[in-house]
């Protein structure tokens, strides 16, 4: 299978080249020139596969590695998860399920891809005879940074730099990154928000002077953000996996449609679900759940994407985003794979901060949007715990709220999988506050209190943080990112 760019239809490269490059030279994102299609018989057979074997099957249909290679990568990656089934599906009531994506080493859904990406990237570099070290440049709104750091820690032939908004992540997220171990890692806070960090990363990828300067240090750039196809493609797997779990439980029959409600910021997670539907998975609706930074919710309601609005720091910081990079891939797909259409919209976004697409393109895609404010989110955490004895994190609570609103508006009783993207222990003060109605500003105290009232085991990745030494506390201006990157690993 070959890949092209969302902005230049003449681009033709392999999957391994797309993974090494990260982003196309024209600024576009790599997309497959075609997608594998699975029949209902295929999908029924998938239910009997382990997570590793299902991932091997699906990734083999996208990437230019052998099945044995991919199987080895998957076994190594997913052996780091604390549950054998990697992404458990919990039944909540007659029509609601929780897909738990937070059982990896950093307790966030990003682990599903970022435990695997180092294997894919190093193999891709070798396959394409890359002599330089690969410098992975990452912008994070909280979870990607730690997952990428942990994934690439001391991986031979790689170095990694993570940029996070200094005042835009939770205390646990920040501490996870600032205490990161490894000789090939660097972490910088920036004075700005996630969009500023992401803009800096994208600009560096297109800056010939920066690329040349890094080449003098024997580095070639790549990315671990979901702009990299190697980050996005593993996420398709858990949509098929969760459908198989509902089949195995006997709660649906093959061919029955289900919904997914997905907390959305950069649009990567829900885009993987959209691609799964495109590949044959029986999906009725994808519910795109936003917090008060509701740029995506508004887009799916009106067809207008407008980042010209106030930016809010919320208790669901991984969704505090106004420029959703993966939406570019969605535009490419719904426009009939038209790079001119994408270029027009991306130019409008860069110059005016907004663009509009025909609403019928959104209707055909089967995605609906909604949002939850802070009070809604806290109420969802409280009510869900009261009803089901299940502590939601602050992002999954947004997805639950938007799903409940969708059901109230439509009466749709289709079985729905809510995608749970993080452990509640990554946001302990807000989760504890929502459940107990008591304020606790100290994160470690909140963790202990949350454990006492919920009975949910404190993950080792959290409990060991209290004794870890802070290694990275540098904060740079958003206009000084280039110097930070150039000097991070200078000998």
Features from the language model and the residues they span:
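PLP-dependent amino-acid enzyme catalytic core
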Residues: 1-491
